[in-house]
Amino acid sequence: MSNAPILLTPGPLTTSTRTRQAMLVDWGSWDRDFNQLTASVCEQLLAIIDGSASHHCVPLQGSGTFAVEAAIGTLVPRDGKVLVLINGAYGQRLAKICKVLGRTFSTFETAEDQPTTAEDVDRLLAADPAVTHVALIHCETSTGILNPLPEIAQVIQRHGKRLIIDAMSSFGALPIDAREVPFEALIAASGKCLEGVPGMGFVFAEKTALAAAEGNAHSLAMDLQDQHAYMAKTGQWRFTPPTHVVAALHEALLQYNEEGGLPARHQRYQDNCQTLLDGMAKIGLHSFLPAEIQAPIIVTFHAPKDPRYQFKDFYERVKAKGFILYPGKLTQVETFRVGCIGVVGAAGMQAAVDAVAEVLREMEVLDI
């Protein structure tokens, strides 16, 4: 494993030896010990948002998108309407989920380098009283842009609407307090800022809303109300759980708390991000976003203009030096992305910058 490249991606990401070793034990899915493991994971997750009084944590097999679809399908009534706020590819995915599920929706789209504002949402909700829910990406992974969640949440509450937050790339690293930020659902996953492995999503669902959602869901497997009710009654998952993923997440959460919890995780990622931004600027590579809206999760960089730069060649050369980067996901300009999360510190980020600089020299890329 020592020769494995460092994943500078937004997840899956580089995990610790302890987290990987936790997957070497096999668990019985109905066994009391595994049920206790699941309960412990949910309890620790709720503690991160101070949400135990107001929300249930409902785990779900699959990727984060599975959990997002389950949240929308379970909590938005068949006759509800969702306002989807979009400034990147994952906001577009929210709209696609609503379309596939047959939920009425409208969209509000801003440029990929422009956060949605609370004023935008205030105006949109005043103009369309039929909206019941607003769906928002907290940190839009296609760029790394951070949308102003607390301000938007307060506007939505003032209008008497309900908020669904895709916090896939922010949960565990950026502060979200359920006592201060009103939301009906917040969705995240095991393989992001918690530094577990992929395979389990989870939804923090407001207790009364979840109880009232019986019969809403479009799917048996993705019915969060039924999943929670069964877990509350039996302690078990309804269908085969990702036992090794849960065990790895439990171990990752122990390390999360040992590190110092959210403040320490946020600080490390912030240090990683600053090291990356400073180092790349010195070699002429500049970030797509201004600093004030850049989340310390993933950074989008403008690609060099030099025709000798080709991303596939660049990617393979950087990979050979021990780092896996991420392709750009923007429509208007050519970019590439570098993640700041995972089991890596500032020294690792500087090593990645050095590798990028060396590769660009090897490729004789001059026009950056």
Swiss-Prot record:
Per UniProt, the keywords (alphabetical) are:
Aminotransferase, Pyridoxal phosphate, Pyruvate, Transferase
Question: What GO biological process term is on the record, naming one?
Answer: organic phosphonate catabolic process
Reaction equation(s) it catalyzes = (2-aminoethyl)phosphonate + pyruvate = phosphonoacetaldehyde + L-alanine
Top-level enzyme category: transferase
Function, in words: Involved in phosphonate degradation.
Which HAMAP family does the UniProt entry name for this protein? PhnW_aminotrans_5 (MF_01376)
Q: Could you identify this protein by its name?
A: 2-aminoethylphosphonate--pyruvate transaminase
Q: Which organism is it from?
A: Pseudomonas entomophila (strain L48)
Question: What's the gene?
Answer: phnW
